[in-house]
Amino acid sequence: MTTKCTLNRSILAVAAVLGLSGSALAAEQKPEVQRLFQSGSYEQAVEAARDGDPASTFIAAQALLKLDRSDRAVAEMTRLRASDNAAWRLIAESGEALIADDAGRAADIARRAIEADGDNPFAHYQLGLAAGKANDWGTAVEGFTRAVELKPDFAYAHYYAALAYQRQRQLPKTAQHFDAFLRLAPDAPERGAVIAILRTIK
C-alpha cells in the first residue's frame, strides 16, 4: 500500500462526497477546443481537437457543421463511434442521423445515449439538437436545460435553450439563457443577433 494508492482512494472519496460520477470525472476535455468553438474560431477548434477526447471530438463536429462541412463532421462522428464508451457511441450515431436530416431517429438514439449515461451533458445536448430539428420544443428545452445543469460553462447549451424557450414564448427564460450565452461567449458570431433579440424582449 503506497502513498499513491492512498491518494487514489482519497480522490475517489472526495468524488463520492461531492456526488461526482465516473462519467463526470471522465468528461474532462481540452478547454481550448470549447473556447475556440465558442469564439467562432471553428477551424482552429477542429485542429485543437485532433486526436483528443470524445467531448473535444464532438465539439469539433459541431464546429464543422457551423462551417457547412457536413462531410467532415460525419468523419468526426465516425471517429467518435469508435469510443469504448457506449454513450459516446450513441451520441455519435445520433449526430450522424441528424446530419442526414433524420431528426426522429436522432432523437431516439440520443435518448438511448442518456439511458446509457445520464450524466453526460452532451447526450442531453444532442437530444436538444435533434428535438429542435423536429420542432419538438418541449423536449428541446428539457435536453438543453439538463445539459446546462451538467455543464454550465457550455455556452451553446444556453444559446439553444434560449431559442427553444423563445419558441415556447417563455421570454424570461429566453433572456436568462441568452444573458448566460453572452457572458460565456462574448466573441461568438451570434452575439449581435442575440443582443438584438434581448432588446426586444426585455
Give a label for each model feature.
Residues Q34, Q62, G95-E96, L129, ...:
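Residue-level recognition of tetratricopeptide repeat
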Residues D51-G52, A82-S83, A116, L150, ...:
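Structural marker of alpha-solenoid helical repeat scaffolds
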Residues P54-A55, A87-W88, P121-F122, W137, ...:
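Helix-start (N-cap) detector for alpha-helical repeat units in TPR-like alpha-solenoids
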Residues A24-I59, K66-D68:
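N-terminal leader/linker segments that initiate helical-solenoid repeat arrays
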Residues A13-S21:
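Bacterial N-terminal signal peptides
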Residues T2-L12:
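Bacterial N-terminal signal peptides that target proteins for export
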Residues I59, A92-E93, Q126, Y160, ...:
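Canonical tetratricopeptide repeat
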Residues Q44, L67-E76, I99-R112, A134-R146, ...:
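Structural signature of tandem alpha-helical TPR/SEL1-like repeats
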